[in-house]
Structures are given as structure tokens and as C-alpha cells.
Amino acid sequence: MESRINWGIIGCGNVAEVKSGPAFYKTENSTLVAVMRRNEDKVIDFANRHGVANWTTNAEALIQNDLINAVYIATPPSSHLQYALRAINVGKNVYLEKPMVLNNHEANILVEAVKRSNVKVTVAHYRRELPVYLKIKELLDSNVIGNVISAEIQIKQTRNTNLIAKTEVNWRTIPEISGGGYFHDIAPHQIDLMCHYFGEVENIKKGSCKENQVSHQDVSGEVLFKNGVQFSGTWNFNALEDKDECTIKGERGSISFSFYTSTITVSKNGLIESYHYENPEHVQQPMIEKTVGYFLAHNSNPCSVEEAAMVTHIMDVFCGT
């Protein structure tokens, strides 16, 4: 039984810089041993600033490195499946960025590969472990607003929004790399939370997404969960103004929150109660701590490939693909 997780990172870009990278060497029983990026100057710079002894420009070399026993894949989605399968093939556990893969077909391939192996794979739907979303789950589980009837997400973003992470090349709008567009960048977190809160899916309906729409600028759909909760979501990335809202309605009240602030509003019996939480410096650290615990057999998987595959399936249906 391993007593420590020695990580290698494939893809040392913006996400790994602050959101996730430092958490691998700040988490107990976890060390960042090696990093990979295709640009030599940039990978050396990353390694030097984060105190990482080993670097490479070759992903296969990192995967084969005997010093590491787990791989964090933080590349654009088009290479997620390729690198995950390679890591699984050599017996390395994997922490895989969202979206897990490009589409439902790739998701099925990965799910089957994990089933056939002894490797552990966690998907980085890290919002599950942030304080604000843990509080929402606590409120729902304690039946504060009674039995939940419905949940609605409304996301509107202008072309110049600052809610989307910026990169040198805007690969998020290139379907062959991202899977579709901005919807594929931000919706996985949001849809995953709905599945995390409400459980198994009964039925999925596509909404207004235009057929053959390349980058999915305007998407909507509905999900009926087996517990009776009706979810509806709309995403518009060419809106006149920004909107970011999720409202969960129950028999005795409602819970409202935003995905880009950390305030929860509970309305019940004519009274309003608010909760505010600060995110940790490295927002993925709570999820990475749970992932390390899972790899060391201390706790269950914080987000399985099967759970992430359902998110991918919902997105494919919403987009008509």
C-alpha cells in the first residue's frame, strides 16, 4: 500500500499555475515530482517557480517516469482521453481535468478502460468540495426548504465577459479541441453539481440549441431526476448582459446562488437568510486532498468517471450531438 502520492503534471498552463498546481505540494502525503509542457522555456520557468526538480517537454516521458505514481492531466480536452489511457496502461492513478473528455463516445471508452484496470481515476469537478457548495448540499440534505421540486440555471455572458479563463490561444472556441465552445468549458461544473445534489437521472431533453451549431453559443435543456426534481438550464454566450444564477425551489422555500460568487440566499416563510464563504487560495486544493485520500484508500472517490460520463452525456444531448 502506497503511503505517499508523487505527482506528475501534464500541461502547466493557467489552471495549474494557481488553481491546482500548488495544491499538489501543499497537500499532506502529496508531492509534485515532475511537470511537462511542450514549450521548454515555459516548463522550466514553471518548474523553477514551483520548486519542481524534474521537467520534460514529452508527455510519454512523464507518464513513464518511475518517480511518479499519479498523473494530473491539465491539457485541453482533446488530449484527455489519449493521456488518461496511457497513464492507465502503465498503472498510474489519474486526476483528470474537466471536461473529462470531448464527447459521450470518448467517455464510454474511458469508463470501460478504468473498469478493466486497477487504476484509480478522479475527475476534477472540484466545486463539489468548495465550502459554498458543501453548504448548499448540507441545506438540501437537511431538508431546509422541504422536498425539492425544481432547479434552474441561467447563464448569460457577453462576448467580452471576464468569467472565462483567458489563454494565449482561445482553444475554448475550437470544437476539435474543447468539444464545442464556452458551454463545454463552464457547464460541466454546473451540471455536475446538479447531478451531485439530486442523484440519478431519469430523462434528458434537448432545448433550443441549433442543429449543427459549431461552438454552441446558445444552449438549453432539461433533466428529470429519478427523485422527481425537474432541472432546466440555459446558457447564452452572446448575450447583451451577464447573468449567473441558480435557483433551487422546494415545498417550503428556495435556495439561490451564483457560480462566480460565494453567497447563498435562502428564502423561507417570508424571511431571507444569507451565507457567505471565501474560496481557498488554490480552489482545487480541497478536491485534490480528497483525491489523494482516495488514492491512498483513506476515503471514497470524490468524483468518478461514471459520474463525469453522465455530465458528458447530458451535455451531448443538450447540444444535439
UniProtKB/Swiss-Prot annotation:
The lineage of its organism: Bacteria, Pseudomonadati, Bacteroidota, Flavobacteriia, Flavobacteriales. Oxidoreductase that may be involved in ulvan degradation. Ulvan is the main polysaccharide component of the Ulvales (green seaweed) cell wall. It is composed of disaccharide building blocks comprising 3-sulfated rhamnose (Rha3S) linked to D-glucuronic acid (GlcA), L-iduronic acid (IduA), or D-xylose (Xyl). Belongs to the Gfo/Idh/MocA family. Keywords: Oxidoreductase. It comes from the Bacteria. It is an enzyme of class 1 (oxidoreductase). GO terms for molecular function: nucleotide binding; oxidoreductase activity. InterPro entries: Gfo/Idh/MocA-like_OxRdtase_N, Gfo/Idh/MocA_oxidrdct_glycsds, GFO_IDH_MocA-like_dom, NAD(P)-bd_dom_sf. One of its GO terms (cellular component) is cell surface. This is Oxidoreductase P35. It comes from Formosa agariphila (strain DSM 15362 / KCTC 12365 / LMG 23005 / KMM 3901 / M-2Alg 35-1). Induction: By ulvan. Transmembrane segments: none annotated. It is found in: Cell surface. Its main location: other. Its EC number is 1.-.-.-. Gene3D superfamilies: Dihydrodipicolinate Reductase, domain 2, NAD(P)-binding Rossmann-like Domain. Signal peptide: none annotated.
